[in-house]
């Protein structure tokens, strides 16, 4: 100690720590009809079909900022919760949603306006909550997937916090009665307790990237939690357990990638959904997914 006084810091430096999880890249949901999926994800929501990968008729990757929906053909899968989206223009979104009724009649498709967001249900029952950009609440995102909220049984949140903190090595916090698990700079998994009976897990998955890819693998593998070995860069697990007693608290497939995975932080093409052939402005075709520096 040289007697030099410590500087007073006006910021909570721990807020900048990401921990071991650095990417929420996609949510994977099977869809039985690619045409209806295009009508919903591309025409109604205004997302962008990936122009380079999965361009055939049996799968679609739909870009939303730095994240994606992966939509392979198969029996419909329904996430037990809500996917949060930030989309740039509420009025234009409502216009697109209204126009999409003609293509999605006879399905579960619906949307409802609320203060601060629009609740949208896909043709097969998946729930989306669409927000306008709001730096104070959702970070500096203008187009993206700030959270995936999952419905869980009563009494499970303390154990789930222990799992993600001790086993996965990321930070958690309780807000408004829900558990927020940080999974990237401005992205969260949110777990909210409910008394409603939940359907059995149907195989849908979320994809995360880990810094300590090998260390977390070893901790999960010691408990027999690894469910699939995909490649040198990727593995999966399904069960979220309480580290204290091993009790299974929730099931959702986690596709885990390393930071050496060839697709890690792959730049994604995002279109400006306001640009059409009838309302065209040269140089404005692309959407900017983040706000400029303050």
Model-derived features with residue positions:
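Vicinal oxygen chelate
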Residues: 1-20, 22-32, 50-51, 60-67, 72-151, ...
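Conserved active-site tyrosine of GNAT-family acetyltransferases
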Residues: 37-42, 125, 159-167, 220
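Minor-groove-contacting beta-hairpin "wing" of winged helix-turn-helix DNA-binding domains
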Residues: 58-62, 179-181
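Solenoidal tandem-repeat scaffolds enriched in leucines and small polar residues
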Residues: 152-157, 161-162, 168-173
